[in-house]
From Swiss-Prot:
This is Ribosomal RNA small subunit methyltransferase G. Its main location: cytoplasm. Belongs to the methyltransferase superfamily. RNA methyltransferase RsmG family. GO terms for molecular function: rRNA (guanine-N7-)-methyltransferase activity. Pfam families: GidB. S-adenosyl-L-methionine binds at G94, L99, E117, S118, T119, V145, E146, R164. Disulfide bonds: none annotated. Its EC number is 2.1.1.-. HAMAP family: 16SrRNA_methyltr_G (MF_00074). GO terms for cellular component: cytosol. Specifically methylates the N7 position of a guanine in 16S rRNA. Gene3D superfamilies: Vaccinia Virus protein VP39. Keywords: Cytoplasm, Methyltransferase, rRNA processing, S-adenosyl-L-methionine, Transferase.
């Protein structure tokens, strides 16, 4: 998509202001995330698709600049965790509108990305976005992650599993860790998170065969909202997850794991 191109969103045409595009590029540069002109164009077009989509509520804002600078940029921040840049197979758990999976697919064209989303209308949007952007090497799985993680095609198959705005850390651990190969990483994208949630997440990870590897602060330039705290919580899988996990659909959220199992 050439700069300035608009995407129609019903009665109104959407476009991203030049100032927002430039701030987006500067933040990527500050993070050391390389993006070609074509990749930047695809990321902008994706933001416009999110802002303009009307068939389902896939995102909470209709402002293209907000979508680009908060949601798409937030997704790209996962690449501050450098091992992710070399991941060959990535799962986006609870993908929603494709965040962070679609931006990461654009920035990591060689990676195989699987978007796991249980809501049918959101899965429809994901397929629409993939087709509209001309992406390959990215698939949509319309199912609960608790079921997906028990399938041989997905269990212990991923180098990385990502989750953004899905659930508390102990719940995310049970969703993500069973998908990982030993040595793989779960990346939980968090804003403000109380210390007790981190400790509970660490205990849940241990039950699942993983450990808390680190917490990365996400620095932001003033023009993209430096006051908005973001953190990446990293779990590393050290051994195979016991076969009883994840538990049946809905149970991880209702009864989150604790360190005792």
């Amino acid at each position: 998509m050439s700069p300035g191109r608009s995407v129609s969103g019903g009665r109104r045409a959407f476009h991203v202001k030049r100032s927002a595009r430039e701030a987006f590029r500067r933040q990527l540069d500050a993070w050391g995330v390389k993006a070609s002109r074509e990749q930047l164009s695809l990321l902008e077009e994706y933001a416009l698709l999110l802002a303009g989509y009307r068939r389902a509520n896939v995102i909470g804002t209709r402002e293209p600049e907000t979508v680009l600078l908060e949601h798409v940029l937030d997704s790209a921040s996962c690449l501050l965790f450098e091992p992710l840049r070399a991941a060959g197979r990535v799962a986006d758990v609870g993908s929603g509108g494709g965040l962070p999976g679609i931006p990461l697919k654009i920035l990591l064209p060689e990676a195989r990305v699987v978007l796991i989303e249980s809501t049918g209308k959101k899965a429809d949007f994901l397929r629409y976005a993939i087709e509209s952007l001309g992406l390959s090497g990215v698939d949509v799985v319309n199912a609960r992650v608790e079921a997906v993680a028990r399938e041989a095609a997905h269990r212990s198959r991923y180098d990385a599993a990502l989750a953004r705005a899905v659930a508390a850390l102990p719940v995310l651990a049970e969703y993500c860790v069973p998908l990982l190969r030993v040595g793989g990483h779960a990346v939980a994208m968090k804003g403000g998170m109380p210390e007790h949630e981190l400790r509970l997440g660490e205990g849940a990870a241990a039950v699942l065969g993983a450990r808390l590897s680190g917490v990365l602060e996400v620095p932001r330039l003033p023009e993209v909202g430096e006051e908005k705290r973001r953190r990446l919580v990293i779990l590393e899988k050290r051994r195979e997850t016991p076969g009883r996990y994840p538990r049946k659909a809905g149970v991880p959220a209702k009864r989150p794991l604790r360190g005792g199992g």
